[in-house]
């Protein structure tokens, strides 16, 4: 999981 929660 990425440190940011975007739908990229």
Swiss-Prot record:
<feature type="modified residue" description="Leucine amide">
    <location>
        <position position="8"/>
    </location>
</feature>
<comment type="function">
    <text>May act as a neurotransmitter or neuromodulator.</text>
</comment>
<keyword id="KW-0964">Secreted</keyword>
<comment type="similarity">
    <text>Belongs to the allatostatin family.</text>
</comment>
<keyword id="KW-0527">Neuropeptide</keyword>
<keyword id="KW-0027">Amidation</keyword>
<dbReference type="GO" id="GO:0007218">
    <property type="term" value="P:neuropeptide signaling pathway"/>
</dbReference>
<dbReference type="GO" id="GO:0005576">
    <property type="term" value="C:extracellular region"/>
</dbReference>
<protein>
    <recommendedName>
        <fullName>Allatostatin-A2</fullName>
    </recommendedName>
</protein>
């Amino acid at each position: 999981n990425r440190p940011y929660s975007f739908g990229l």
